[in-house]
Amino acid sequence: MSSAGNSKKSVPVRSTLPEKAKAVAGEAVQGALVDLLDLSLVAKQAHWNVVGPRFRSVHLQLDEVVDLARAAADTVAERASAIGVSPDGRAATVAKESGIASFPTGYISDDDVVRAMVAALEAVSVRMRKRIDDTAEPDPVTQDLLIGITGDLEKHAWMFQAEMGPR
């Protein structure tokens, strides 16, 4: 169980959310944090190891995903803290709870990187949409935050799909 559900420790930050809403929102932002941290790591791994004729364009686009994922991870972690939920971005938590498939080691072709990034972005987007649905009633502020991030993720998924073009 992630720290989002840990209510045994004293919480120095009070939330204006009722406990049930706080639990739902906390679980949503913790899950988003894990997925976004892993997405940033996957994109950076791909960035270092991409090879092929489209190296430069894919390499640069991967940096954009890294920047987005890192900024969004910080945003959702701060939302967790703001509602009195301690965020857990430890490597062990990310490895255990991420919804992104394992990324291969070694050099990887630009085509394979693009396919892997589409899959990773889609996996995170699907999970984010579930979180959007889950937070609609209990915490529209968290929902709004997740909607904005999901829009950015889906934009990058589209851009990577456009990289593949008709083949």
Language model: regions and residue ranges:
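Acidic, low-complexity proline/glycine-rich segments
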Residues: M1-S15
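Short, charged, low-complexity loops and linkers
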Residues: S15-Q30, A101-D112
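Charged, amphipathic alpha-helical segments and their flanking helix caps
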Residues: R56, D63-D74, D133-T150, E154-W158
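Helix-loop segments that flank and shape redox-cofactor active sites
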Residues: T16-V24, L39-E64, R127-V141
